[in-house]
Regions:
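Bacterial N-terminal signal peptides that target proteins for export
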Residues: 1-8
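Sec/Tat signal peptide C-region and signal peptidase I cleavage site
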Residues: 18-22
C-alpha cells in the first residue's frame, strides 16, 4: 500500500531549526508493506537504529560496446564524527518519544538487552559507531565502491541483517563475510535469531534505518570512429566528461522502519541488483527521495583532481591505428575526475535532523494506525 502525503518541507525545517533556509515544498511518499499482522502483537521493542551517512560516491560511466570509461568520485568534507553521533543519539530519542506518544506499548530496551538472544544479535564484538561500509552508487558499472559511515545510538549497536535480507547495493563480499563469521562461531543467521526473540517475548521487533545522501556523481562517454582518406587510416575520437552536484537528501526504499512480527513469514519477492533491504516481515518505507537541496554546502563542488589512462595501444585521446576499423577495437580511454563537496556542519546536521524527524513522524503514524 502506498500513500502520498503533501507537506511543505520548508515549514518542517523552519519549525525544527529556525536558522535553516527555505526549501521547496514537496510531498513525502510512504510505502507500507505487510504490517497488518502488527495487531496480533502490538507491543513493540526498538532493537536497532542506524543512520547511513554517505561520504564518498563513485560513478563509472561507459558507452555501449566501448572500452572507454569516465569515473566521477565525490567526497563529502566538513562534517565531524562527534556531530553526527550526537545527532544520531537525539534522533533515536526522538523516535522512542514519538512511539510512546502515539500510544504504542514500547518495551524498554533494558528489558530486552538482558536476553541472551539480543546479545547473540549484537555479537561478541558489536559494530562500533560509526562503522564503515561500502556500496554501489546508482548502479555504477565496474567494481567501484562508494563509502558511508553507519552511526548507531550510544548503547545500541547496529547489527547487520542476514545476507539474503540485506540491500543488493551492498557488496556481496561484505555480506558473505558477516554470514560466514556467524556460521564459524556456531551462531544462527540473524533473521532466525530475530524471529526466535520476537516469538519468545511475544513482541514485534522494530529496526529503523535512514540513508543520508549528500550529492550526485555522473558522467558520459562517447566515441566516434571515422576513416581518414588522406592518411588512409581509421581514427577513433573519444570524448569523456564527469560531473558532481551537491544535494542533501534521504534516499528512498532503504530508508525504512522494519517490523519482525512473531510467526510471520516475509512475502517472497524476486530479488535483483536493485532490491532494497528486506530485513523483516513488514516495512514502512520512504518511497520517494526527500530532498533539502544544496544549501548545506559551502559553494559548488570543487574539482580536486583528474587523471586519464589510455587503454590499449594509444597515445592520445584521438586514437589512430593503421589497418581499418578492426585494428582499433580494444583501444580506449579511462578518465577519473575527483570532486569535493564541503558542508557547513551546523546546517548539515540541522537539516539531517529535520528530514529524519519528519519521516519518523510519518512512520509512527502508519505504525500506530496498524496497531489499532
Amino acid at each position: 500500500m502506498k500513500r502520498r502525503i503533501g507537506i511543505g518541507l520548508a515549514a518542517a525545517l523552519l519549525v525544527t531549526c529556525p536558522t535553516t533556509w527555505a526549501t521547496e515544498a514537496q510531498s513525502i511518499e510512504i510505502k507500507v508493506e505487510d504490517i497488518a499482522s502488527l495487531k496480533k502483537y502490538p507491543k513493540v521493542a526498538l532493537i536497532g537504529y542506524a543512520i547511513e551517512q554517505q561520504n564518498f560516491l563513485v560513478k563509472m560511466s561507459t558507452s555501449w560496446g566501448s572500452t572507454s570509461s569516465s569515473t566521477s568520485e565525490v567526497t563529502l568534507e566538513g562534517v565531524s564524527t562527534p556531530a553526527m553521533q550526537a545527532a544520531t543519539d537525539r534522533l533515536y530519542a526522538d523516535l522512542v518519544k514519538r512511539l510512546e506518544a502515539a500510544g504504542l506499548e514500547v518495551v524498554k530496551l533494558d528489558e530486552v538487552r538482558n536476553d541472551p538472544m539480543f546479545a547473540d544479535l549484537k555479537g561478541d564484538k558489536p559494530q562500533p559507531s560509526p562503522s564503515e561500509t561500502s556500496f554501489v552508487f546508482d548502479k555504477s558499472k565496474g567494481f567501484k565502491n562508494s563509502k558511508a559511515l553507519v552511526f548507531s545510538p550510544s548503547g545500541l549497536p547496529w547489527h547487520i541483517p542476514s545476507a539474503h535480507e540485506e540491500a543488493a547495493r551492498f557488496g556481496a563480499g561484505d555480506k558473505m563475510s558477516a554470514n560466514l563469521s556467524r556460521a564459524f562461531s556456531g551462531k544462527q543467521p540473524v533473521a532466525d535469531v530475530e524471529n526466535a526473540l520476537a516469538k519468545a517475548r511475544g513482541i514485534t521487533l522494530l529496526k529503523a534505518y535512514y540513508v543520508v545522501g549528500f550529492g550526485r556523481a555522473g558522467g558520459r562517454v562517447s566515441e566516434m570512429t571515422s576513416f581518414n582518406y588522406v592518411s588512409n587510416r581509421s581514427e577513433k575520437t573519444i570524448s569523456a566528461a564527469a560531473n558532481a552536484t551537491a544535494e542533501l537528501y534521504l534516499d528512498k526504499t532503504d530508508t525504512r522502519l522494519a517490523l519482525r512480527v512473531p510467526g510471520e513469514t516475509p512475502t517472497l519477492r524476486m530479488r535483483n541488483n536493485s532490491s532494497p533491504a528486506a530485513d523483516g516481515s513488514g516495512f514502512i518505507r520512504l518511497d520517494k527521495k526527500l530532498s533539502a537541496g544544496a544549501d548545506f554546502a559551502v559553494g559548488e563542488p570543487k574539482n580536486a583532481n583528474s587523471t586519464e589512462t589510455q587503454v590499449g595501444n594509444a597515445l592520445s585521446t584521438t586514437l589512430a591505428v593503421v589497418g581499418g576499423l578492426a585494428g582499433i577495437r580494444g583501444v580506449g580511454s579511462a578518465s577519473t575526475q575527483e570532486f569535493v563537496v564541503t558542508a557547513n556542519e551546523q546546517r548539515y546536521v540541522d537539516t539531517v535532523e529535520a528530514l529524519i524527524q519528519t519521516v519518523q513522524a510519518e512512520f509512527v503514524d502508519r505504525l500506530a494506525a496498524a496497531a489499532k
